[in-house]
């Protein structure tokens, strides 16, 4: 399974790619596999503010619906509007074209509570 080492990960299977004070967020390959074919996504609105671990949206698949959580506190700067018409991009390219939103972090210290790729791999192995 692909777990890029240039990102951080949450226990709820979101990934975070940090550039300065901007965090790009998506769901992991593991999460999209568990959900199966993604058919709909409810995106947050640009300008909305969320605290860490708050529900920011929903990902729906043919199997289930799953909440999407803010990995850090911040304000939504951009959402991937391509996902409205093509939610399957999350399945085909979860770490690239399937990114979900970008947020300006208001408390970058919260990044220390996230997992690196190795710790996320261990989390997945513990669940098997």
UniProtKB/Swiss-Prot annotation:
Q: Which UniProt keywords apply?
A: Lipoyl
Which residues does the record list as N6-lipoyllysine (modified residue)?
Answer: 63
What Gene3D superfamilies does the database record attribute to this sequence?
Answer: 2.40.50.100
**What does this protein's record comment on cofactor binding?**
Binds 1 lipoyl cofactor covalently.
Q: Which SUPFAM superfamilies match?
A: Single hybrid motif (SSF51230)
> Residue ranges of the Lipoyl-binding domain?
22-104
Superkingdom of this entry's organism? Bacteria
An example of a Pfam family matching this protein is: GCV_H
Q: PROSITE patterns from the entry? A: BIOTINYL_LIPOYL (PS50968), LIPOYL (PS00189)
This protein's GO CC annotations: cytoplasm; glycine cleavage complex
Q: How does it assemble?
A: The glycine cleavage system is composed of four proteins: P, T, L and H.
Report the sequence similarity comment from the record. Belongs to the GcvH family.
The protein here is known as Glycine cleavage system H protein
* Species assigned in the record: Methylacidiphilum infernorum (isolate V4)
- Lineage, uppermost ranks: Bacteria, Pseudomonadati, Verrucomicrobiota, Methylacidiphilae, Methylacidiphilales
């Amino acid at each position: 399974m692909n777990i890029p080492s240039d990102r951080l990960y949450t226990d709820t299977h979101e990934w975070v790619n940090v550039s300065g004070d901007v965090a790009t967020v998506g769901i992991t390959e593991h999460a999209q596999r568990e959900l199966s074919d993604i058919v709909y996504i409810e995106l947050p609105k640009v300008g909305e503010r969320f605290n860490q671990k708050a529900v920011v949206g929903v990902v729906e698949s043919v199997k289930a619906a799953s909440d999407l959580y803010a990995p850090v506190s911040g304000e939504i700067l951009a959402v991937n509007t391509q996902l409205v018409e093509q939610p399957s991009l999350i399945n085909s390219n979860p770490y690239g074209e399937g990114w979900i939103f970008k947020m300006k972090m208001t408390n970058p210290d919260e990044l220390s509570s996230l997992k690196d790729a190795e710790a996320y791999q261990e989390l997945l192995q513990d669940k098997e």
